[in-house]
Design a protein with these regions (language model features):
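Short, contiguous alpha-helical
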Residues: 32-87, 126
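Amphipathic alpha-helix face/heptad-repeat signature
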Residues: 6-9, 13, 42-46, 74, ...
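Short helix-capping/linker segments at secondary-structure and domain boundaries
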Residues: 59-65, 88-90, 131-140
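C-terminal interaction segments
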Residues: 114-160
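Acidic/His metal-coordination segments adjacent to aromatic residues that form catalytic metal sites
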Residues: 1-8, 29-40
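Acidic-glycine-rich active-site phosphate/pyrophosphate-binding loop
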Residues: 22-30, 101
């Protein structure tokens, strides 16, 4: 396939996704990869997927990738997808609180403050965990509280 054909295919696919999302309410269910997913989660997942593939490209070029505040969408994806990740890893889901510091020292929190399970730390590490993009040998800066949170960080997260 010629490069211009790939770009045209991508533009048409993107337009199709935008059209579907524009006509849908946030809670409407869509079928995606054999699963039911609401429109909001689908949109956030597509953003996370694009970010994750950008990491792959930078990795192939042996260049460092610097996250921006826009990585917040990937962080949200990780939290929204926690229950599904639990199913894939055959672990009973428990409420999870996530507290992150992102680029430009932005603070992001997801989940119930009263949760017995929490993960805190650097947003870049969290995002790489939930997209299956932790480089070999990388020491995570995430701290966990609760058995489920400890397991969650070690899950085999689906590489999107």
């Amino acid at each position: 396939m010629r490069p211009q054909d790939v770009i045209e295919w991508w533009r048409m696919s993107r337009a199709s996704v935008i059209e579907i999302l524009a006509k849908s309410s946030p809670g409407k269910k869509l079928t995606w990869w054999k699963n039911e997913i609401d429109c909001r989660t689908f949109a956030v997942t597509k953003l996370a997927e694009t970010w994750a593939h950008s990491l792959d490209v930078y990795d192939a070029m042996k260049k460092d990738y610097e996250d921006t505040v826009r990585v917040e969408h990937v962080a949200l994806y990780g939290w929204l997808n926690a229950e599904q990740a639990s199913k894939v890893n055959k672990t009973k889901y428990q409420d999870l609180r996530v507290e992150l510091i992102g680029p430009e020292y932005k603070a992001w929190q997801f989940g119930d403050e009263q949760s017995e399970n929490s993960i805190k730390g650097n947003a870049s590490d969290w995002c790489r965990v939930v997209t299956g993009r932790v480089p070999k040998g990388h020491k995570l800066t995430l701290s966990t509280e609760g058995d489920f949170a400890k397991k969650f960080v070690k899950f085999n997260h689906v590489k999107i």
